[in-house]
Amino acid sequence: MKLWGGRFAKGTDKLVDDFNSSIRFDSRMYRHDILGSIAHANMLGKCGIISADESSLIQSSLKNILNDIEAGKIDFEIDAEDIHMNVEKILISRIGDTGKKLHTGRSRNDQVALDIRMYLRDEIISIKEMVAVLLNTLVKMSESNLDTIMPGYTHLQRAQPITLAHHMMAYFEMFKRDYQRLCDCYSRMNILPLGSGALAGTTYPLDRYMVAQELGFDDVTSNSLDGVSDRDFAIELASCLSILMMHLSRLSEEVILWSSHEFSFVELDDAYSTGSSIMPQKKNPDVAELARGKTGRVYGSLMTLLTVMKSLPLAYNKDMQEDKEAIFDAVDTVKMCLPVFSNMIGTMKVRKENMYKAAQGGFTNATDIADYLVKKGIPFRTAHEIIGKMVLYCIENSKAIDDMTMEEFKSFSDKIQEDVYTEISLEKCVSGRKLVGGPARETEEKAIENAKSFLSSLD
């Protein structure tokens, strides 16, 4: 008989049991469910709602159940529906009627809200640690490539010269924001919903703050309806993870391009590449491709959560059972991607000479020649037009701007002097951009110093 079966004249059909059950995926929350129940039982005893002996027996029995689960001695039952009812059923089978007192002042509605918050906050901590590893990897790579000149791109067309350090530190900033978003998400998640009951709280004199303190929550929810029906924290986490995966996907795309023979900017380590079953010469960037592909999977989890919640009236509805597989899969996917991605980035070989050669083509110093004319007193728009014509001339004559003679330069503007050759060198183009946020070495060194300071401050 179901623990809630008193109102029913007959049991549920087996098809309903299978359809209704969530134990196959919510069993991963067993530890959090039991720890929440231990804290609840402790509070019930301290508040005199059950006796101290009963509270002690329940707590010790729950600890034994936890140990038995972790030792693989317990098989969960589908007809017990979920992790909450499975644990309670086992408890009652071991200590009888005393076990039936555990659920006093509690509903599965606030119980599951507690469990999933506890589970996800642990996962946030784990993911933050993985992001921190990636951030460290990016800093190390940047520090090793402060003078590695490469083309910066817009529209995937060569635009202006930068350094690989500057490029990778751009990703540092992205993943730093991801880390900070996870911290913010944690703070909103870390609120105790237990005590909200089914939807309207309880008449028992519970001490919610005692439970919150024991379980490490910062506060308790202030509205019982919201406490049991809120899944914003899961949606927010899925959103944070989607943005994180978007950043992984962008860097993946660049690694895929850079490792191609068409670019040949980097070579992936053999340990993070794969081959072809038919083409012996192939060395494929499968890690980057899978990270790019799995991004859509995490997006799908976010859309699932939003769709599940979009039309639900207050308070709890069974639809909300669908939240778990979506957020669990998003978490699992991100945790699978981050470590292997960090190792791939950390072990890839940079082909500095190819990057430099690419920066020499595509007229990446054209903006600097325009700026050179501006410094000589020519309005920027006029300078822009002059250099545009100069680029066209070079294209038609198959030469780089650097290869033009002084006579050729003078044909476009008599303001151009011999110092132009120094001013438009790739090294000068990069070193001249000293503003905060620019690619000049001294600016990038400061950015790396700030990055290290941020990383050292992480808890």
UniProtKB/Swiss-Prot annotation:
Keywords: Amino-acid biosynthesis, Arginine biosynthesis, Cytoplasm, Lyase. It holds the Pfam family Lyase_1. Signal peptide: none annotated. InterPro entries: Arg_succ_lyase_C, Argininosuccinate_lyase, Fumarase/histidase_N, Fumarate_lyase_CS, Fumarate_lyase_fam, Fumarate_lyase_N, L-Aspartase-like. Pathway: Amino-acid biosynthesis; L-arginine biosynthesis; L-arginine from L-ornithine and carbamoyl phosphate: step 3/3. It is found in: Cytoplasm. GO terms for molecular function: argininosuccinate lyase activity. Its EC number is 4.3.2.1. It catalyses: 2-(N(omega)-L-arginino)succinate = fumarate + L-arginine. One of its GO terms (biological process) is arginine biosynthetic process via ornithine. It comes from the Bacteria. Its main location: cytoplasm. Belongs to the lyase 1 family. Argininosuccinate lyase subfamily. PANTHER family: ARGININOSUCCINATE LYASE. NCBIfam families: argH (TIGR00838). This is Argininosuccinate lyase. It comes from Ruminiclostridium cellulolyticum (strain ATCC 35319 / DSM 5812 / JCM 6584 / H10). The lineage of its organism: Bacteria, Bacillati, Bacillota, Clostridia, Eubacteriales.
